A protein has these predicted regions:
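Metal-dependent polysaccharide deacetylase catalytic core of the NodB/CE4 family, i.e.
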Residues: 65-68, 115, 136-269, 311
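Secretory/extracellular carbohydrate-interaction modules
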Residues: 368-434
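Extracellular carbohydrate-recognition regions
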Residues: 327-356
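N-terminal Lys/Arg-rich, disordered targeting/topogenic segments
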Residues: 1-18
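His/Asp/Glu-enriched short active-site or ligand-binding loop at hydrolase and phosphoryl-transfer sites
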Residues: 146, 202-207, 254-319
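Short, aromatic/His-centered strand-loop micro-motif at the edge of beta-sheets
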Residues: 432-459
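Short tryptophan-centered beta-strand motifs in secreted/extracellular beta-sheet-rich domains
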Residues: 389-391, 449-473
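Hydrophobic membrane-insertion alpha-helices, especially the h-region
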Residues: 19-39
């Protein structure tokens, strides 16, 4: 019987090698974890070399409701946010800070030729996490807005005071506020039933049933179902004063100062509220507490003629394409803009008539001109008389899109199948020959009132043969 002998030295050597490999593996895991949790990148401010030659050059402001990994009806996806901000960077935009805006209006200092002020308005943790990774990549800086009440709430999805201090230290964030709380008054549902006052949680639970006829907490008197104030002037004054005082108390307790930037909810009232007396109280507090106020929404450009307490921003919707945002900014600024084309090989098959088109996989994202239309023409040497078309028309219910068949160059002749405001219309040489309300296919046939944000994708099949046309919507024969 043979004997096998083991060398203690060899065994120890194997243990040492195994320990070294395990140590290296743990170090790699540790480094990866640290990189995921902490950022070592610092924001690099723009150089004075790119300042505009004129003091008149203003800035655009973009304000996102919030960021979600996949996106939803309100929050933009990380993919879309990165695409939009990257397109702006490629067009020469750099981010500016609150101090730059203050110096622009109070000291007449110049800004970069293409200046972008970036805001995020929901104060959510996931917004800060997802947005910062993108801003680090692009060397962009933003302002995170919060409601003071959320800093001391038990809801973990909102940033607290410690979070805000950490964000400010990262160099990629500045702080701003929407006030003390998000709350609603004078609310009606879509059936015109009076709901009264709702907090943000109550509002969000039934938001799909609420009519656009409502107000934010600091905008008006609290009123009954007939529009009659339920409070005296003194009660209204005390109510609004309380919100500003609580906001100050919480911020000074949690982050040791009141943010210098305010965005009054809601925008576009003309002043600082929908009632003159309410507006005067808000105006007093705004001027006393803040260096600047974003008071309007819908336009991106602020210039020398704007008031620092009446600034405007554009709020990109979560469903906007990159070209839609670029088109809105181009319309506001009239500055040169490079739009996104996407798949250039597929784009080569089409002639652009108006607007801008992005080709992504099997999709064409067509963006219309401001107050105009977007149109593409398929390049072909053939004159198709009989055709079959199958496509999905994606987008919002409110609006118009369609397909021209057998059309001449200016589309004055031919067949036009139009989807407009939940109706299907068919035109022959610009004469409407058929119209059908698609609500007839729905469970709620009587619904005619749609919100501008309501979305509906439609599967459209069209067969045109000689003088006969067949149109099928969502597998239902229309004509």
């Amino acid at each position: 019987m043979s004997k096998i002998s083991f060398s203690p030295e060899k065994k120890d050597r194997k243990k040492k090698i195994r320990s070294i490999l395990q140590g290296i593996f743990l170090i790699i895991i540790l480094i990866t974890t640290i990189k995921a949790l902490f950022s070592f990148t610092k924001y690099d401010r723009f150089s004075d070399e790119i300042l505009s030659p004129t003091e008149e050059t203003g800035f655009i402001a973009l304000s996102y409701f919030g960021v979600d990994r996949d996106g939803n009806n309100t929050l933009i996806s990380t993919k879309n946010l990165e695409a939009q901000l990257e397109a702006l960077k490629n067009n020469g935009y750099v981010t500016i800070e609150q101090q730059d805006i203050l110096d622009y209006y109070t000291k007449g200092k110049k800004l970069p030729s293409k200046s972008l002020f970036l805001l995020f308005e929901d104060g959510r943790r996931d917004t800060a996490i997802f947005a910062q990774k993108i801003m680090e990549k692009l060397n962009f800086k933003g302002t995170i807005l919060t409601y003071a009440g959320n800093l001391i709430s038990d809801d973990p999805k909102f940033l607290d005071g410690e979070d805000l201090l950490d964000l400010a230290k990262s160099t990629f964030w500045e702080l701003g506020t929407n006030g003390y709380r998000l709350s609603y008054i004078n609310v009606f549902n879509k059936e015109s039933q009076y709901l009264g006052e709702l907090d943000s949680l109550e509002f969000s639970k039934i938001s799909n049933t609420i009519d656009r006829e409502y107000n934010h907490y600091l905008m008006d008197y609290i009123r009954d179902e007939y529009g009659v104030p339920k409070e005296t002037y003194e009660e209204m004054n005390n109510r609004i004063d309380y919100d500003y005082e609580e906001m100050c108390r919480i911020y000074e307790s949690e982050i040791y100062k009141i943010p210098s930037l305010y965005a009054l909810m809601h925008a576009n009232t003309g002043k600082f509220g929908t009632n003159d007396k309410v507006s005067s109280i808000n105006e007093k507090w705004i001027n006393e507490l803040f260096n600047m106020n974003f008071n309007r929404e819908g336009f991106s450009l602020n210039d020398r003629d704007s008031s620092i307490y009446d600034l405007t921003r554009i709020q990109p919707q979560s469903y906007w394409s990159t070209n839609h945002l670029l088109m809105r900014i181009w319309d506001d600024t009239k500055s040169n803009m490079s739009f996104i084309v996407g798949d250039e090989k597929k784009a080569f098959n089409f002639e652009k008539i108006s607007g801008e088109a992005e080709f992504v996989n099997d999709k064409i994202i067509l963006t219309s001109m401001p107050k105009g239309r977007g149109a593409l023409k398929l390049k072909t040497d053939s004159k198709y008389k009989n055709v079959t078309v199958s496509t999905i028309l994606k987008g919002n219910i409110i609006g118009s899109q369609g397909i021209h068949l057998r059309a001449n160059d200016n589309q004055s002749k031919g067949i036009y199948i139009q989807l407009q405001n939940n109706h299907i219309n068919i035109f022959d040489d610009n004469n409407k020959i058929y119209s059908f309300n698609l609500s007839e296919f729905e469970e709620n046939k009587d619904k005619e009132k749609f919100d501008i944000k309501d979305r509906r994708d439609r599967l459209l099949d069209v067969k045109l043969y000689d003088n006969k046309i067949t149109v099928v919507i969502d597998d239902k024969i229309v004509v």
